[in-house]
Amino acid sequence: MPPVPLLRLQCGVNSYDWGKVGHESAAAKYAATTAASDFSIQSDKPYAELWMGTHPSLPSKDLETQRTLLDMVQDNQALISQEVSERYGGKLPFLFKVLSIRKALSIQAHPNKKLAEKLHARDPRNYPDDNHKPEMTIAITPFEGLCGFRPLVEIIHFLKAVAPLRQLVGERAASEFENTVKGSEESEDPAVTEKNKQALRTLFTSLMRSSPESIEAATKELVAIAQNSPETFTTSSSTPETNPTNPAELAAITVRLNGQFPNDIGSFVFFFLNFVKLEPGEAMFLKADDIHAYISGDIIECMASSDNVVRAGFTPKFKDVDTLVDMLTYSYAPIAEQKLEPTDYPYAVLNAPAYSSGSSCILYDPPIEEFSVVKTDLKRQGAKATFDGISGPSIVICTAGAGKITVGPKTEEVNEGYVFFVGANAECIIESTGEDTFTTFKAFCDLTGKEDMVNGN
């Protein structure tokens, strides 16, 4: 009889400088619940990312046998399904993570499939994968980040209201941009939108090519304004209709970011990008080539299985400004268009205690084939959700409460931080065993109905 396709996973955690420190880090706490014998949380060490998947940089292991999940799915293709295995080279198509963010991650974008192949061939050390990396972020705790270019009217406002920004991009570049997009900032005509994107590209490139000396001088002035006049920061009496509603908050973030990365171009990129705040359970989706930066919070992140990053600010790591300014799409849109609204998940059945306690199964389903995520909240002891088998693999992590997970004849206890792999086509039942809400996130790949989505598009 084949083994039951339910594996408890041991997952590794990365210690990047931006991670939350010691026991403050959800990534560290979750890793510690199923840790290797040589792992213990150090109180002064940052812990940034818990990785769940088959990516070779930090592969998850089966707790019982200590074999990597990659080995196991390559030995037994049925665990991820023949179709998924053939399409994704015998590996999980997604990488599931928990990020615990204390200070800003780099301003970055992830190359699309075509560019990823080119960058990997040219520079495999800095670009270790040939795959694209669209990704989705779901907040576990309140989250702040930057995501995609702002609407053009907002960028124009900041060019007028933030003197050090205008000084840095240069009067000529600022005026040319304003004159090009004036009166057509919100046009939906494709030809006009394309013209606006090219104007934004020119302006942004001008900013990104600023000299270190001019960045330092402009930053000094910017921070002084933020500290001395927080209530009127980034506002203008001549254009009150476009003033931000939260000037003091923007001033505080400007000071905080400069404290983390002194004299960094990122403090000015901030005025080009949407400032996004997510409450727990809210999500955003980033297409390949979308510019973004995370600032603070604990999040669940799911992405196509790639570790490619093109960085250009808020980082001590390799910066590739030329590639970044060339690769971006320069699409601009309000925050609402970056957020991803979940819907009810139709392939799970809740029992009576689950229904009567207001338990829920909601689906975050981005417009790509590699992954979707279901968040389940079971709000009473004995509340149960039965998930239909799907024709692809799943990884489940518990972020709150206690319960159990059952696949076939096998039942495992589940506590906060526990991670499980569920094989393709297996019905999966989760049940709350405590009084507190039992919360799980389940990342999965099911190609059914996604035949029209071509990899990389």
UniProtKB/Swiss-Prot annotation:
Zn(2+) binds at residues 108, 110, 135, 292. Binds 1 zinc ion per subunit. GO terms for cellular component: cytosol. It holds the Pfam family PMI_typeI_cat. Keywords: Cytoplasm, Isomerase, Metal-binding, Zinc. This is Mannose-6-phosphate isomerase. Belongs to the mannose-6-phosphate isomerase type 1 family. Its EC number is 5.3.1.8. GO terms for biological process: cell wall mannoprotein biosynthetic process; GDP-mannose biosynthetic process; mannose metabolic process; protein glycosylation. It is found in: Cytoplasm. InterPro entries: Man6P_Isoase-1, Mannose-6-P_Isomerase, Pmannose_isomerase-type1_CS, PMI_typeI_C, PMI_typeI_cat, PMI_typeI_hel, RmlC-like_jellyroll, RmlC_Cupin_sf. Pathway: Nucleotide-sugar biosynthesis; GDP-alpha-D-mannose biosynthesis; alpha-D-mannose 1-phosphate from D-fructose 6-phosphate: step 1/2. The active site is at residue 311. The gene is pmi1. Its main location: cytoplasm. Its cofactor is Zn(2+). GO terms for molecular function: mannose-6-phosphate isomerase activity; zinc ion binding. Involved in the synthesis of the GDP-mannose and dolichol-phosphate-mannose required for a number of critical mannosyl transfer reactions. It comes from Aspergillus fumigatus (strain ATCC MYA-4609 / CBS 101355 / FGSC A1100 / Af293). The lineage of its organism: Eukaryota, Fungi, Dikarya, Ascomycota, Pezizomycotina. PANTHER family: MANNOSE-6-PHOSPHATE ISOMERASE (PTHR10309:SF0). It catalyses: D-mannose 6-phosphate = D-fructose 6-phosphate.
